[in-house]
Amino acid sequence: MAGHSKWANTKHRKAAQDAKRGKIFTKIIRELVTAAKLGGGDPDANPRLRAAVDKALSNNMTRDTLNRAIARGVGGDDDGNMETIIYEGYGPGGTAVMVECLSDNRNRTVSEVRHAFTKCGGNLGTDGSVAYLFTKKGVISYAPGLDEDAVMDAALEAGADDVVTYDDGAIDVYTPWETFGQVKDALDAAGLVAESAEVSMIPSTQADMDADTAPKLLRLIDMLEDCDDVQEVYHNGEISDEVAATLE
């Protein structure tokens, strides 16, 4: 399957993401602890933990830090009895947005999430309002420059659902989330080095963003990601190469 240019859509946010690296690490550690507590410390037997481990490594977290977080979870440190909460809503331009949180205080979390939606021209919805538009999948991403046929052959042989090649040469491999770890291991063994690997919520439809709505959507994402309790933000906003170029 072919797609638009991917790197133009993401590179303009890289500097902001790098500036948030400390906060990103805190959130990943929280997920590692919770995943290990709920499903055990073996990533091969715990898909949620495996996804957290791969995300940690994609963000250049050291093995020592990663292993300490897993040990905390196995040892019963739950960081204040955290629970996973999913919020759903609509963002600028009618975008569907899902917000995955880890929280020990629902009232605090929903207040912060609702504030971000309201501030950016969106609104927080009810359970199920947009979830039907998303499917949970593993996503293994490769930067431009790899042999597309080699990635596709290795991915499909390993049990991937789909391989998307973009106009700029970037490649995304989609897997069932339950077998994400096994597919990633097979691709690693084939010598294919991923740019990133994570379990995500993939939208079934896209909402096209224009020069007016795109910056508003990015502001909403940034505000949500600034919330300590927010782990992930998923949306179906699509930013064209032309619009992305105006945001850099």
Curated annotation (Swiss-Prot):
Subcellular location: Cytoplasm
InterPro entries associated with the record: Integrase-like_N (IPR017856), TACO1_YebC-like_2nd/3rd_dom (IPR048300), TACO1_YebC_N (IPR049083), Transcrip_reg_TACO1-like (IPR002876), Transcrip_reg_TACO1-like_dom3 (IPR026564), YebC-like (IPR029072)
GO CC term, one of those recorded: cytosol
UniProt GO BP: regulation of DNA-templated transcription
Gene3D superfamilies membership: 1.10.10.200, 3.30.70.980
Matches recorded under HAMAP family: Transcrip_reg_TACO1 (MF_00693)
Record protein name field: Probable transcriptional regulatory protein NT01EI_1596
Species assigned in the record: Edwardsiella ictaluri (strain 93-146)
